[in-house]
Amino acid sequence: ELGHQVMAIDSNEDRVNAVLSYVTNAQIGDSTSEYFLRSLGVANFDVCIVTIGGNFQSSLETTSLLKELGAKLVVSRAERDVQAKFLLRNGADEVVYPEKQLAKWAAIRYSSEHILDYIELQDDHAIMEVTIPPEWMDRTIGEINIRKKYNINILALKKDGKLDMSITPDTQLCRDESMLVLGKYASIQKCFRL
């Protein structure tokens, strides 16, 4: 969908067939086989993502082989911190925790009716879509002075599913709007009483 060439690899033919319409190329094969990976030319790939679930040994072997064969960037999936340590020691450039990240997102997203969406950034920062507190209605962004009081930036206002990023200190906050804010998670919690 983003215009990149994507190759999917799996040892299970049914899983390969299930993703055919989403990828440029799909191969049935054993990712722990050096011969198989070499035949695909993994050294020419910009990014290799290892998402093997349920068999950490295969994930570790695949990660290590990809790096040995010259893969530029290897991103591997882990379920626990100890797995991440092994993956990083054996060739992974980055490790993702899809289940853990989704659980955290859901916990934050559904912890308050005022949080409409949440994107975690580094160093305890986040972008959140939040409802506008009732006491801010019909006031301007300059009047509430959120940047000075809480060190939070308003990135955009959202109404009827459309983002308005052309906001100024004179922009008035209205009912049925939400706002996209950027700041430290703790500051956002404090400001919006989450």
Predicted regions mapped to residue ranges:
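Cytosolic regulatory regions of ion transport systems
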Residues: 1-194
